[in-house]
């Protein structure tokens, strides 16, 4: 999870997040190279009073500065499209979880099981136990199995929300009247925190998300206790 004075991403806990981190580094490298080239040209222009008359109307230069940006955009677009398709495509999910945003809490429904649904509210500060995280703990955590493909169906009952778990690379808008889909899969057991990432009213900051990813055996035991 995030910690104080953190300027980078959280550690990736899902394949999608790993791909997003690689894409971030790839894009940042291109931006750094372009910035270095621009600064170099500016420094040359400021340090010399000579005018290169041969390049003021050169067909070769115009060709280069037309083709080169197109190539750079392609180098950015191709991996981006690949990740978009990876995030959207899901075949035969092992589990489907429906998430509904409300002002100002989340409700969850395990669509593969009858009557397995609950609301998830932020735990008030006076009710926190030692070691709990302020503004991030909830009364009902979402328990999911690891190493399984999970389909998330996300919508809203009132206004726009956004269901976001940074470590898993998920940020999907919850829109009233629309059912959006996201893919969740991780091989790392742990507790992952997120929050609503769309300003949705006075208590927007009090809509935490807590996922508890456990091995399949413990998930089945949790189901037996809950159902």
Curated annotation (Swiss-Prot):
Binds a dinuclear copper A center per subunit. It holds the Pfam family COX2_TM. Its cofactor is Cu cation. This is Cytochrome c oxidase subunit 2. Cu cation A2 binds at residues 196, 198, 200, 204. It is found in: Mitochondrion inner membrane. Residues 46-59 are mitochondrial matrix. Keywords: Copper, Electron transport, Magnesium, Membrane, Metal-binding, Mitochondrion, Mitochondrion inner membrane, Phosphoprotein, Respiratory chain, Translocase, Transmembrane, Transmembrane helix, Transport. InterPro entries: CcO_II, CcO_II-like_C, CcO_II_C, Copper_CuA, Cupredoxin, Cyt_c_oxidase_su2, Cyt_c_oxidase_su2_TM_dom, Cyt_c_oxidase_su2_TM_sf. One of its GO terms (cellular component) is respiratory chain complex IV. Its EC number is 7.1.1.9. It is an enzyme of class 7 (translocase). GO terms for molecular function: copper ion binding; cytochrome-c oxidase activity. Mg(2+) binds at residue 198. It catalyses: 4 Fe(II)-[cytochrome c] + O2 + 8 H(+)(in) = 4 Fe(III)-[cytochrome c] + 2 H2O + 4 H(+)(out).
